[in-house]
């Protein structure tokens, strides 16, 4: 009994050792397989089958189970070992970088992209459209200016050619004529040009005369306005006395001949004395002047020259005062 128990213990120990060896070999082989798969891709199925057949001729189901266990345990262990070695080798800097990259990717996935790019693109597009519109406006303005300049140049050329054409036509029309007829035609053209110039001068003179007449009429109206203002002032004054109305028509008719009589006084030695016509309906034929009568006193100088100096100064001062009053009141100076 003691021997059998010792034998069984030894057999169990040997079996355990074998199993442990197999597991270690299978783990190393699985590690090599995973490394080769990661490095060079998958192996063909024929190689893996031949390798498993050559190892140990056992039952198919047992081999499957062993493979599954060994592959799962070895792959898990190898992954943990590799991850630990990588993390140890890289250190904290890699972890920080990886955490930053992960946070960035999460933010980029969760949050939408900022609109700054779109706004900048919109602004750039707006700027492009604005610059294009400005360029178009400038081109249009330049085209218009060029067209206007071309039109002005064409008009100037036409006028210049017309002037040259007139001279050329005159010369061409006179070339086939004899010299005597050419001279006559030229004289006729000169006379026509002079007549046109005379007409232009006459038109200018007429315009000037019309302007003078208008000025005189305006002055006459100014005199009438001044008289009216004076009359209104006299009426508004305290010394005004009401009077009965009298028509001025008869007064004007009777005053006109008296004015004519007073206009003719001594203006010189050769003054004319005309008898005024009677105011009645019938005019005597004897009263009509038939000849010029001279008032000649055989005097060499005017009697005003023989007045004393004091009297002449007084008359001159009175004249100046009257002129000043008329100028201030606005009435025309006589």
Curated annotation (Swiss-Prot):
Major location (coarse): nucleus
Localization (cell): Nucleus speckle; Nucleus; Cytoplasm
Modification after translation (UniProt): Phosphorylated.
Region (Disordered): 1-173, 201-222, 241-290
Annotated keywords: Coiled coil, Cytoplasm, mRNA processing, mRNA splicing, Nucleus, Phosphoprotein
Record's compositionally biased regions (Basic residues): 14-24, 78-118
GO cellular component, one term: cytoplasm
Amino acid composition bias (Basic and acidic residues), ranges on this chain: 1-13, 44-62, 132-166, 201-218, 247-262
GO biological process, one term: nucleocytoplasmic transport
Coiled-coil portions: 180-234
Function: Plays a role in pre-mRNA splicing. Involved in both constitutive and alternative pre-mRNA splicing. May have a role in the recognition of the 3' splice site during the second step of splicing.
Quaternary organization: Interacts (via Arg/Ser-rich domain) with LUC7L3, RBM39 and RSF1.
Protein name (record): Serine/Arginine-related protein 53
Organism encoding this protein: Rattus norvegicus (Rat)
Source taxonomy: Eukaryota, Metazoa, Chordata, Craniata, Vertebrata
């Amino acid at each position: 009994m003691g021997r059998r128990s010792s034998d069984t213990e030894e057999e169990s120990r040997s079996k355990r050792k074998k199993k442990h060896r197999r597991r270690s070999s299978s783990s190393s082989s699985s590690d090599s397989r995973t490394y080769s798969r990661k490095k060079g891709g998958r192996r063909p199925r024929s190689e893996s089958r031949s390798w498993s057949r050559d190892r140990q001729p056992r039952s198919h189901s047992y081999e499957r189970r062993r493979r599954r266990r060994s592959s799962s345990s070895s792959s898990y262990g190898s992954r943990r070992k590799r991850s630990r070695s990588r993390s140890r080798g890289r250190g904290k800097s890699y972890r920080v970088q990886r955490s930053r990259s992960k946070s960035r990717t999460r933010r980029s996935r969760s949050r939408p992209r900022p609109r700054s790019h779109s706004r900048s693109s919109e602004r750039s597009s707006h700027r492009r459209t604005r610059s294009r519109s400005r360029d178009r406006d400038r081109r249009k303005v330049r085209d218009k200016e060029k067209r206007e300049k071309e039109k002005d140049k064409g008009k100037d050329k036409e006028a210049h050619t017309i002037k040259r054409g007139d001279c050329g036509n005159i010369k061409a029309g006179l070339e086939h004529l004899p010299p005597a007829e050419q001279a006559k035609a030229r004289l006729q053209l000169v006379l026509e040009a002079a007549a046109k110039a005379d007409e232009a001068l006459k038109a200018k003179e007429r315009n000037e005369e019309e302007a003078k007449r208008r000025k005189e009429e305006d002055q006459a109206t100014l005199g009438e306005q001044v008289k009216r203002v004076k009359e209104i002032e006299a009426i508004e004054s305290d010394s005004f006395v009401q009077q009965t109305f009298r028509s001025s028509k008869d007064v004007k008719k009777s005053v006109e001949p008296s004015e004519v009589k007073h206009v003719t006084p001594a203006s010189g030695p050769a003054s004319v004395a005309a008898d005024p016509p009677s105011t009645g309906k019938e005019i005597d034929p004897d009263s009509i002047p038939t000849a010029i009568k001279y008032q000649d006193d055989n005097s060499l100088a005017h009697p005003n020259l023989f007045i004393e100096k004091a009297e002449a100064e007084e008359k001159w001062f009175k004249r100046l005062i009257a002129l000043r009053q008329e100028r201030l009141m606005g009435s025309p100076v006589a």
